[in-house]
């Protein structure tokens, strides 16, 4: 786009304009607005110095503003092509203590283990599915060539 090489600090995911963008983890909205080549940008601040950037957005989800708490899976914005972009896509970036890391290979902290009551509930809710999937073990499906 610029005619020269410039560091790219994230990963781009092509998607149609308006595709929902979801928070990748529980966080607080640090920034939601326009910022240079990112165009419309949301920055989420997670625990322990982690931040995630979501760039080139067409619009922000209702209520997304600095200070707002979001949960993993909440819709925060919509894919677009704002800023320096040749087509609609999501620019996704992970930063730790301000330094960018490759989102596809960065080692992130795991989730805390479930409390005993939550684990029991999870196992109860998944038992029937586990049984159904168990029936498929050893099953060979015929296919037409």
Which residues does each predicted region cover?
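Catalytic cores of peptidoglycan-degrading enzymes
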Residues: 1-128
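C-terminal recognition in membrane/secretory proteostasis and scaffolding
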Residues: 124-145
């Amino acid at each position: 786009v610029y005619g020269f090489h410039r560091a790219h600090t994230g990963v781009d995911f092509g998607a149609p304009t308006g595709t929902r963008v979801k928070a990748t983890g529980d966080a607080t909205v640090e920034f939601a607005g326009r910022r240079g080549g990112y165009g419309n940008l949301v920055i989420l601040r997670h625990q322990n110095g982690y931040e995630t950037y979501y760039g080139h957005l067409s619009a922000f989800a209702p209520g997304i503003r600095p200070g707002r708490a979001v949960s993993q899976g909440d819709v925060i914005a919509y894919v677009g092509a704002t800023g320096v972009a040749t087509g609609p896509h999501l620019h996704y970036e992970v930063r730790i203590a301000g330094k960018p890391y490759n989102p596809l290979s960065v080692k992130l902290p795991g989730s805390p283990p479930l409390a005993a009551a939550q684990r029991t509930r999870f196992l109860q809710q998944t038992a029937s599915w586990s049984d159904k999937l168990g029936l498929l073990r050893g099953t060979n499906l015929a296919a037409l060539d």
